[in-house]
């Protein structure tokens, strides 16, 4: 979004001047923070940011910077989506639509980052802004007619999604335009940006559920990424987790068309239950799945959360034989304790306790958390 770009070439020059005076500024942080999310059965989990800008449209950084930012942030793939119709820096840099991709791809190779050729079709409302990924060439998208521009991308087999639907709407309440309906009916529109920067769009989320559209979360970053986000649990850039058959551009494309994605945004994961459930299950490891309880004694269950996001659980029901906390936080990257207390009425013997919870920050719909079960093998002593 253009409102995010409050600096341009001038600020980039100031930043470069600062870095020139502090040659250690980049070197101090030239390290990658891995985003540890489990693979799903049959798929690898790839971390992607598929909406960002450089000086070749209205961004404030060179394409090589976007690549190293992505590497540092633990990403696997990016798409530089410079505007087709808006090139305010044309007096200073090339107006070749493909140049930012060419530069980024060379820089990405030694870092193992996948760079997808893409562009942002930038129109007024309606139809607004749409990203086209996996383009063969960008020039044909420079059309006066909105539909012709989108069709030019679709004719190349591009994956097309609608960016920040609520951006210019009153109270940011998204409106499904007739133009979007036309693109959808034509089979061109395949996804929606449910999270743009720090903004979550519940209306777009529900549209994805109802219309079977892919969900995406992207930074739409224009300035240096460190000016907007940090590496804390709540401060990271939004990321689209793509479940691909392999680590390749072709596999990412297939996965997006198949809607295999989950969004990592702030302290939330957003997606379909079929992907959130195995992601949650794969994130956890119970250190002591077998416990003993006598009478009203307690047992402490140690649960490791191997992801960078804490899980906020609320109990849905209690099993017959034990009490469990109403709310539990399984802290990111740490081992948390769940205290179970016997009710004193359990018959002696061994059985599996099923503890039903709702994970409040794993959203399958705007107002619906993911239902899960934690299982513990308990031996009740006489």
Descriptions of predicted regions:
Residues 27-49, 127-135, 170-382:
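Charged catalytic cores and adjacent phosphate/nucleic-acid-binding surfaces used
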Residues 1, 155, 210-211:
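Short, well-ordered loop/turn elements at secondary-structure boundaries
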Residues 29-159, 163-165, 171-173, 178-179, ...:
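A metal-dependent hydrolase metal-coordination microenvironment
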Residues 22-26:
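Sec/Tat signal peptide C-region and signal peptidase I cleavage site
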Residues 1-12, 20-21:
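Bacterial N-terminal signal peptides that target proteins for export
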Residues 5-7, 85, 123, 376:
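Intrinsically disordered, low-complexity segments enriched in glycine/proline and serine/threonine
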């Amino acid at each position: 979004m253009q409102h995010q770009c409050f600096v341009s070439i001038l600020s980039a020059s100031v930043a470069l001047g600062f870095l020139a005076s502090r040659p250690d500024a980049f070197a101090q942080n030239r390290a990658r923070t891995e985003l540890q999310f489990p693979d799903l059965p049959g798929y690898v989990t790839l971390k992607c940011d598929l909406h960002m800008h450089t000086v070749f449209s209205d961004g404030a950084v060179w394409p090589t910077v976007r690549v190293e930012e992505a590497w540092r942030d633990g990403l696997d793939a990016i798409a530089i989506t410079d505007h087709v119709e808006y090139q305010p820096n044309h007096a200073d840099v090339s107006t070749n639509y493909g140049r930012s991709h060419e530069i980024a791809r060379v820089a990405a190779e030694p870092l193992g980052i996948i760079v997808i050729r893409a562009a942002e079709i930038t129109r007024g409302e309606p139809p607004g802004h749409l990203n086209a990924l996996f383009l063969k060439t960008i020039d044909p998208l420079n059309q006066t007619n909105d539909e012709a521009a989108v069709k030019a991308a679709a004719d190349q087999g591009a994956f097309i999604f609608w960016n920040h639907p609520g951006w210019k709407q009153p109270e940011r309440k998204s409106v499904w335009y007739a133009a979007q309906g036309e693109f959808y009916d034509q089979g061109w529109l395949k996804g929606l940006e449910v999270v743009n920067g720090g903004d979550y769009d519940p209306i777009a989320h529900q549209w994805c559920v109802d219309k079977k559209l892919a969900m995406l979360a992207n930074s739409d970053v224009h300035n240096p990424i460190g000016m907007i986000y940090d590496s804390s649990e709540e401060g990271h850039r939004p990321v689209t987790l793509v479940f691909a058959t392999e680590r390749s551009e072709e596999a990412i494309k297939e996965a997006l068309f198949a809607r295999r994605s989950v969004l990592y945004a702030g302290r939330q994961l957003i997606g379909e239950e079929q992907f959130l459930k195995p992601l949650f299950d794969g994130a956890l490891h119970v250190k002591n799945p077998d416990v003993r309880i006598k009478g009203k004694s307690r047992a402490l269950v140690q649960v490791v959360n191997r992801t960078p996001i804490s899980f906020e659980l609320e109990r849905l029901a209690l099993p017959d034989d034990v009490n469990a906390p109403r709310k539990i936080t399984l802290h990111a990257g740490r081992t948390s304790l769940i205290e179970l207390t016997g009710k004193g009425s359990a018959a002696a013997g061994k059985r599996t306790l099923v503890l039903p919870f709702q994970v409040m920050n794993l959203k399958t719909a705007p107002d619906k958390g993911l239902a899960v079960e934690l299982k513990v093998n308990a031996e009740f002593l006489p």
